């Protein structure tokens, strides 16, 4: 999965499409979205 090093720095989140895999939970998309891909979110 692609990682976001810009949009999820404080959360150290993983950039991936929904749904997030357990035990990660979706904490986006705004403002923690993955670059230009709104279908991708920040999972942490």
Swiss-Prot record:
Entry keyword Disulfide bond: yes
Intrachain S-S bonds: 8-42, 15-34, 20-43
Signal peptide: none
Keyword list, A-Z: Disulfide bond, Nematocyst, Secreted
Main subcellular location of this protein, as a coarse class: other
Tissue: Expressed in tentacles.
Gene Ontology CC entries for this record: extracellular region; nematocyst
Source organism superkingdom: Eukaryota
Keyword Mitochondrion recorded: no
Compartments where located: Nematocyst; Secreted
Function: Peptide with unknown function. Does not exhibit antimicrobial activity against Escherichia coli and Staphylococcus aureus. Does not exhibit any effect on human ion channel TRPV1 in a Xenopus laevis oocytes assay.
Protein name per the record: Peptide Hact-4
Highest classification ranks of the organism: Eukaryota, Metazoa, Cnidaria, Anthozoa, Hexacorallia
């Amino acid at each position: 999965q692609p990682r976001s090093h810009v949009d999820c720095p404080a959360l150290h989140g993983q950039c991936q499409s929904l749904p997030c895999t357990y035990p990660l939970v979706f904490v986006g998309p705004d403002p923690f979205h993955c670059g230009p891909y709104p279908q991708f979110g920040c999972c942490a």
